[in-house]
Regions:
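N-terminal catalytic cores of NTP/NDP-binding nucleotidyl/phosphoryl-transfer enzymes
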Residues: 1-59
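Residue-level signal for inorganic ion chemistry
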Residues: 13, 67, 106, 167, ...
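A non-catalytic, amphipathic alpha-helix used as a structural packing/dimerization or gating element
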Residues: 18, 22, 62, 166-173, ...
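Hydrophobic/aromatic residues located in beta-strands of well-ordered beta-sheets
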Residues: 34, 106, 136-137
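N-terminal Rossmann-like or analogous alpha/beta NTP/dinucleotide-binding catalytic cores
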Residues: 45-132
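Generic structural signal for residues in well-ordered beta-strands
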Residues: 75, 136-137, 262
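Glycine-rich, Lys/Arg-enriched anion-binding loops that position phosphate/diphosphate groups
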Residues: 129-231
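Phosphate/ribose-recognition catalytic cores of enzymes acting on nucleotide-derived substrates
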Residues: 184-296
Length: 296
C-alpha cells in the first residue's frame, strides 16, 4: 500500500496536518509507505494570477521540514510549469501518482481539487480517482473558532492584520521569518538599542502587519527574547522602505552575515512616529519591559 496526499501545503497548517497525519497513519496500519507530493513554485506565479500580490507562509525548505516532521516516508516536489498546469485530473493521477509512485490510496481534504478540469465536486472527484484505480480517502476539514475552515488564505489574512497569536494558533506553531543579518545605519546603537536587520531568504514570504512585536530569536544556535519592529521607521524618515529589525535582549555579539530566525510571540503596538530619538528611546524601554513578561 502506498498512501499519498497532494497539494501546495503552504504553511503546513493544522488543516494540512489532518490530511498528512491520515496518510501517515493509514500507511503504518497497513505496513505501507506514505508520500506527500507538492509543487513549486506556486501556481499563481507561473500562471500570473495576481502574482505580484502573492505572499507565502512557508519557503520550500520550511515546508519540507514540517512535512517530514509529521513522519512522512517520502516528500516529493514536482516542478509546476504551464505544461503541468494543463494536466487533467485523470492525467495527473495516471501519469504521476500511479505511473511514477505507484500510489494506491489518495487522502483528500475537504477543498481538494484536481487537475486543469478543476474538479471540486466531492462525488465527481472521488469517482475520477476510483476510475484511475486509486482508493480515495476523505478527511473532514479543520474548523477554526470562528466556524470557518482553516486555510492558508485565512491565515495570511490574519497575519497581514498583525494577529500573530491567532495566526500561530491556526498554524499550530509560531509564525517565523528566516534570513541573514545585514548592515543597517546603526542608529539603534546610539540610543542603546542595537538592532539586527533581516534580509529574508524567501522573498515572497509574508511579513506580518507593521508594528512592534515580541519575538523569539534564534542565532548562533541559541534562543533569546527580542522586540521586532516591522515598518518604515517614521521617526528617522530615511525613506528605506519596509524593514524588519530586531533588538535581541541581553545580547551583544557581532552577527552580521549570520543566519537569524525570528518567531512571533505577540504584538505590542503599532509603529509610531516620535518627535525625537529620546522619545523613541523611552518607548523602547517600555517595550523592553513588556517583552520580558513573555517566555521564549
Amino acid at each position: 500500500m502506498i498512501v499519498a496526499a497532494t497539494g501546495f501545503f503552504d504553511g503546513v497548517h493544522s488543516g494540512h496536518r489532518m490530511v498528512i497525519d491520515k496518510a501517515v497513519a493509514l500507511a503504518k496500519e497497513n505496513n505501507g509507505k506514505s508520500i506527500i507530493v507538492t509543487f513549486w513554485p506556486h501556481p499563481r506565479n507561473v500562471l500570473q494570477l495576481d502574482a505580484d500580490k502573492l505572499r507565502l507562509l512557508s519557503s520550500l525548505e520550511e515546508k519540507r521540514q514540517r512535512v517530514l516532521a509529521c513522519g512522512v516516508d517520502e516528500f516529493v516536489v514536482l516542478p509546476f510549469t504551464r505544461d503541468f498546469s494543463g494536466l487533467t485530473a485523470s492525467e495527473f493521477l495516471s501519469r504521476y501518482l500511479i505511473g511514477r509512485y505507484g500510489v494506491t490510496h489518495l487522502v483528500l481534504g475537504y477543498d481538494h481539487h484536481l487537475g486543469s478540469d478543476d474538479v471540486r465536486d466531492v462525488d465527481q472527484r472521488d469517482r475520477i480517482v476510483r476510475m484511475c484505480g486509486i482508493v480515495p480517502v476523505p478527511v473532514s476539514d479543520s474548523i477554526s473558532a470562528s466556524g470557518r475552515a482553516v486555510s492558508s488564505t485565512m491565515i495570511r489574512e490574519i497575519l497581514s492584520k498583525g494577529d500573530v497569536v491567532l495566526g500561530g494558533s491556526l498554524l499550530g506553531y509560531r509564525y517565523a521569518l528566516d534570513g541573514v543579518v545585514v548592515s543597517g545605519q546603526r542608529i539603534g546603537r546610539t540610543i542603546g538599542f542595537p538592532t539586527a536587520n533581516l534580509s529574508l531568504y524567501e522573498p515572497l514570504k509574508l511579513i506580518p502587519a507593521g508594528g512592534v512585536y515580541v519575538v523569539c530569536v534564534t542565532v548562533l544556535g541559541k534562543t533569546h527574547l527580542g522586540i521586532c519592529n516591522i515598518g518604515t521607521r517614521p521617526t528617522l524618515g530615511d525613506g528605506r522602505g519596509q524593514i524588519v529589525e530586531t533588538h535581541i535582549l541581553d545580547f551583544d555579539e557581532e552577527i552580521y552575515g549570520l543566519d537569524l530566525r525570528i518567531e512571533f510571540i505577540s504584538r505590542l503596538r503599532d509603529e509610531q512616529k516620535f518627535d525625537s530619538l529620546e522619545d523613541l528611546k523611552k518607548q523602547l524601554k517600555k517595550d523592553l519591559s513588556a517583552a520580558r513578561k513573555f517566555e521564549i
